[in-house]
Amino acid sequence: VKNFKKWRKQARATVLDAMLAPPPYTTEYETEILAEEQREGYRAKKLCFNLTGYSRVNAYVLIPDGEGPFPAVVLLHDHGGHYTIGKEKMIRPFGVDKAVLDDADAWAANCYGGQYAGDYLAAHGYVVISVDALYWGERGRKEGADGSKYADNAGNFMMLGRSLSAFMNYEDMYTTDYLATLPEVDPKRCLLYTSPSPRDRTRS
């Protein structure tokens, strides 16, 4: 195939086929605002919405001050072998226990020079959203973070004819679809931003 548009269409179909069964799609988001605060040049919101037919999730959304619509970014948090926080690695959390805030601040300091990517982008005119990947942060094990259990569950996904990494890819795509519905967002200018470890998630 020499035509790039045709190649992209065929390649995408091949990748999606390899990703096995997707979680059920929904547009019945039933968004609930859990908390809000004003930051310097932008507003921070903590939302809850239906990401899939299976999962209702919490997310942080940052919206620049001023008149939109704005370009928008889905922030994919890193793996890092650190499961106690997810979206909080990308956007500085609020309305959380001090332990969570301290955890997030320490991670940002150790891995990102003290800079939260989401807060930086929002201060420069982008709407941003970040959601915990399955098993991270508020979607983690209630028994506590355990990397070996994460590996076990990845194997369980395979036994059920699914792929955990592909499941995350689908949720990333669904998050992008949700982001594009927000009134402050220009749906033609949405992109993904990721740290090094989940870079494969941006390819689909």
Give the location of each predicted region.
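Cap/lid segment of the alpha/beta-hydrolase catalytic domain
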Residues: 77-170
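Short beta-strand element of the alpha/beta-hydrolase
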Residues: 70-78
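N-terminal cap/lid segment of alpha/beta-hydrolase-fold proteins
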Residues: 26-66
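Alpha/beta-hydrolase fold nucleophile elbow
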Residues: 185-192
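Conserved small/polar residues in nucleotide/adenosyl-binding loops
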Residues: 193-202
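N-terminal pre-domain segments of enzymes
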Residues: 1-16
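Acidic-histidine catalytic/liganding microenvironments
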Residues: 182
